[in-house]
């Protein structure tokens, strides 16, 4: 019961999610919870290491930076959000990015793709702005047996894998979403993706993080276990790796421009 209680978030009025103040509150929560902050740090470090191993040069941009703190880990990153946030370098929509053709080395997004109302438009922009060999690095909700149970029953965001279209009606940048969009684009409709975006290629689709985020309490609940057990939980997750296609809550997706 503790697990289910912890997962349940407010179902009613979600308009507060679209306020910049809410995003800053989320940032303070992340920074104040060592277990949750460490999850973000590990994800940021993975991206930074991958990016720095690439031979390409150019701008590295985070889209939908929100309350994150990637710049503390990777100082040269240009942070951005659709909302006016004092902690971000730029404000713009993923549908219309203010960068020249073939100018970006990398685009990083953490739990952002499934909030973008028109992903075809975003991917067109990514295809335009990325240089040859540049890449999009995304960490997104996974669509697994376990994640469907969690996201459909205990999370406020829609999680509907039955819809045909990648687009959805949006009243606000955070209150509207569909958590299955990454799975739709890069698994169910991969052939369509390849046809629509001939210059882009799926390179990595990897499931991970089945239990760690739940135990952190996320943004809405307290930690379920103390921070000193983080290493043990990481070890347990490694043991569970063969089951990730069934139990992972997140996935890393890397798309490269040919």
Where are these regions (language model features)?
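Conserved class I S-adenosyl-L-methionine
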Residues: 136-169
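A C-terminal cap/extension of S-adenosyl-L-methionine-dependent methyltransferases
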Residues: 191, 195-258
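A short beta-strand submotif of the Rossmann-like class I SAM-dependent methyltransferase core
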Residues: 106-112, 138
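Conserved N-terminal segment of class I S-adenosyl-L-methionine
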Residues: 10-95, 251
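Acceptor-substrate binding/catalytic loop of class I
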Residues: 172-190
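A short glycine-rich, Lys/Arg-flanked "PGG" loop and its adjoining helix->strand segment in the class I
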Residues: 120-135
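A short acidic, Gly/Pro-enriched loop at the edge of an enzyme's catalytic core
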Residues: 95-107
């Amino acid at each position: 019961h503790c697990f289910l209680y912890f997962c349940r978030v407010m179902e009613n009025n979600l308009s507060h999610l679209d306020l910049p103040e809410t995003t800053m509150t989320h940032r303070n929560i992340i920074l104040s919870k060592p277990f949750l902050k460490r999850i973000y740090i590990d994800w940021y470090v993975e991206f930074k290491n991958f990016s720095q191993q690439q031979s390409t040069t150019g701008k590295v941009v985070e889209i939908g930076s929100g309350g994150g703190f990637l710049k503390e880990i990777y100082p040269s990153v240009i942070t951005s959000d659709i909302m006016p946030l004092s902690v971000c370098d730029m404000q713009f929509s993923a549908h219309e990015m203010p960068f020249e053709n073939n100018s970006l080395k990398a685009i990083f997004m953490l739990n952002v793709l499934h909030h973008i109302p028109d992903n075809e438009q975003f991917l067109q922009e990514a295809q335009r702005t990325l240089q040859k060999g540049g890449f999009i690095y995304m960490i997104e909700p996974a669509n697994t047996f376990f994640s469907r149970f969690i996201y459909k029953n205990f999370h406020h965001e829609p999680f509907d894998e039955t819809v045909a279209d990648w687009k959805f009606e949006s009243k606000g940048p955070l209150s509207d979403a569909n958590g299955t969009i990454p799975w739709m684009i890069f698994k169910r409709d991969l052939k369509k993706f390849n046809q629509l975006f001939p210059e882009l290629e799926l390179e990595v689709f990897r499931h991970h993080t089945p239990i760690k985020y739940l135990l952190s309490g996320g943004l809405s609940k307290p930690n379920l276990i103390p921070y000193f057990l983080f290493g043990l939980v990481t070890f347990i997750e490694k043991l569970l790796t063969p089951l990730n296609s069934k139990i992972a809550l997140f996935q890393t997706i890397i798309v490269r421009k040919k």
